[in-house]
A protein has these predicted regions:
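Transmembrane helix-loop junctions at the membrane interface of multipass transporters and ion channels
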Residues: 69-71
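Mg2+/Mn2+-dependent nuclease catalytic core
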Residues: 1
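Feature 926 captures the class I aminoacyl-tRNA synthetase adenylation module centered on the KMSKS loop
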Residues: 13-52, 56, 76-348
């Protein structure tokens, strides 16, 4: 801090102008026990060794997210491993995208206008979410909250683009509808490009490498314009619809997991929505089939005809029912429970 003040006063005195517009002062990097790193304690960490083992990007990611602005941070190797795993996730997601870009004829004239009519609810949702994250990250960067901005970019990349959108889009990529496939590829590459640019200041090496394989761009990412918010990409209604569908899928998955139902076992899902939630559920039928192991999705106006033993899940304005006889093999379940009872009795 002292040298900053000294330089500022010297520049004002000698040149009558500020030496720099902004100064960002960060805390110390301490060891995992909170001690200052020193030769006498022997607790110093050689960054070159970490880079050799995990890569420079993993170290940069760790240092950027390890603390809140202005505070000291504790250095944990587990956080470097966590960062390395994220970089691997980004690399594998990008490889998946590139594997589906091998048919160059699908990329001819691939623009928003050319695929607009074939964009699905999921496409619009991920484009809108990417746009919103871009806005938030830009704000955090302007406020010098670099760690918060990186965390938001990380959460979006891992939890929404990789875990949800890529899984949602697979049936279209593997299908035979050419225009549906083009719309999916456009969305995949459009959002991936934004992700790479958002992450580039933090993990420059892997993002530059991945960017070089994108057939939809030219030049280097380091000279590309940083993403900015675009009002045309803001689709809040689609986000709300998709969030409701995803919430329903999560709850169905939780029910199946609690009952030890394998993903390979399909089961019918009956949905009873309120009038305002019905359009979202209609749009989400295929997503329930592919992501919630539904053999059939039936949307009803009332609970009439639903089996009494059906397992139910309630979310915002929507009730979901799964007939128990489609989930459970009663004889096997009875056998399992009897074994657990016998084991418990033997331990008494």
């Amino acid at each position: 801090m002292t040298w900053v003040v000294r330089m500022a006063f010297s520049a004002m005195f000698c040149m009558n102008e500020k030496p720099f517009e902004h100064v960002l002062i960060h805390g110390l990097v301490r060891d995992s026990e909170g001690r200052k790193m020193s030769k006498s304690l022997g607790n110093g960490i050689d960054p070159l060794e970490i880079i050799d083992q995990y890569g420079a990007d993993a170290l940069r990611f760790t240092l950027a997210t390890g603390n809140s602005p202005g505070n000291d941070m504790r250095f944990y190797m587990e956080r470097v491993e966590f960062a390395r795993n994220f970089n691997n996730k980004l690399w594998n997601a990008s490889r998946f995208v590139f594997m589906n870009l091998e048919d160059e004829s699908l990329l001819e004239g691939l623009t928003r206008e050319s695929v607009k009519a074939n964009l699905t609810l999921a496409d619009k949702w991920i484009i809108s979410r990417a746009n919103r994250v871009v806005k938030e990250v830009n704000y955090n960067m302007d406020q010098f909250d670099l760690g918060i901005g990186l965390q938001k970019a990380y959460d979006f990349t891992w939890s929404e683009y990789c875990d949800w959108y890529i899984e949602i889009v697979k049936p279209r990529l593997y299908g035979h509808d050419r225009e549906a496939k083009r719309a999916a590829l456009y969305t995949l590459t459009y959002v991936l490009e934004k992700i790479l640019k958002l992450l580039h200041p933090f993990i420059p090496f892997i993002t530059e490498e991945i960017y070089s394989y994108l057939p939809t761009v030219e030049g280097y990412i380091i000279t590309a314009e940083y993403p900015h918010y675009e009002e045309a990409d803001d689709m809040l209604a689609e986000e709300e619809k998709m969030n409701l569908i995803m919430d329903g899928i999560r709850n169905v998955r939780n029910v199946r997991a609690e009952m030890n139902v394998p993903p390979s076992k399909k089961a019918k899902i009956i949905i009873v929505p309120t009038d305002d939630k019905r359009p979202a559920m209609e749009d989400g039928k295929e997503y329930f089939k592919s992501l919630a192991s539904a053999s059939e999705v039936e949307i009803q106006n009332s609970k009439d005809g639903i089996p009494e033993d059906a397992v139910s899940v309630v979310i915002d304005g929507v009730e979901l029912f799964i007939p128990l006889d489609e989930l459970v093999d009663f004889e096997k379940e009875k056998e399992r429970l009897n074994k657990e009872r016998d084991k418990a009795l033997a331990e008494i």
